[in-house]
Amino acid sequence: MSEQNKMLMRRAIKEVWNGGNFAAVDELVTSDVVLHLSKPGDEIHGPEGVRQFYTALHAAFPDIHFTIEDQLADGDKVVTRWTCHGTHQGEFQGMSPTGKQISVTGIDIDRIADGKVVECWPIMDELGMLQQLGAAP
């Protein structure tokens, strides 16, 4: 089961995160999926929320690419350590495009049930990204 769960997350990264195939979200997440973002209480709910999140990310960084650096699975959880690169070409969190390149590291912890993501806890170097964009010292 752990290997199947890892394959599910590899597919999500290949098709949605990198490929922009937002229609695949319905095949990858449950109808009540929750993404628990790093700010307490900040959450994304349901497949439509997930689609909107990745659509906005791809609009801001059209060339974004995630690379899996490491992946572990135990029981119903998969931990994926990743690096992403992209160019800020569209509005991102209220910030106008800067044309700057980013390189950001992060980890996602995903809980899988019946072959779909039920919950996700993404953690990334947000400060490092903002510094690269010139929005933080």
Task: Show the residue positions of the predicted features.
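C-terminal and inter-domain tail/linker signature
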Residues: 1-137
